[in-house]
């Protein structure tokens, strides 16, 4: 095998490695998006189950409570602020105390995700 053939093979391998590296980067971005969506959906599911459980419990106790207390309880939802923060994070903004409100630039923030873990 001549020097030119070896050089061509190394050049081809370098090109293939570059393409694989690019594909790996694309997969990493897709995986990050999927993990973020999975995390958001898990939290949303948790809150919906919690609201459903409260709704079922309220149905049992509504007849025992005065009308004013029932209206107050249904008017303010306990997870409303959390849902707003989750929506802001989903829209691409930081919700952590370090960079609150600044754009995330399509990256996950461990401090923002830590906030979600603390509120479970």
Swiss-Prot record:
Biological process according to GO: DNA replication
Feature: compositional bias, Basic and acidic residues: 45-63
Binding locations of Zn(2+): 94, 96, 109, 112
Subcellular localization, as worded in the UniProt entry: Cytoplasm, Nucleoid
Residues covered by region (Disordered): 45-80
Family: Belongs to the YabA family.
Protein name: Replication initiation control protein YabA
């Amino acid at each position: 095998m001549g020097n030119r053939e070896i050089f061509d093979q190394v050049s081809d391998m370098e090109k293939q490695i570059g393409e694989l590296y690019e594909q790996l980067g694309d997969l990493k971005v897709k995986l990050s998006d999927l993990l973020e969506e999975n995390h958001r959906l898990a939290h949303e599911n948790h809150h919906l189950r919690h609201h459903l459980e409260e709704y079922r419990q309220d149905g049992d106790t509504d007849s025992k409570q005065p009308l004013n207390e029932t209206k107050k309880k249904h008017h303010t939802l306990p997870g409303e602020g959390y849902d707003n923060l989750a929506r802001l994070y989903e829209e691409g903004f930081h919700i952590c105390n370090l960079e609150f409100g600044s754009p995330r630039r399509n990256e996950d923030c461990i401090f923002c995700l830590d906030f979600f873990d603390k509120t479970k």
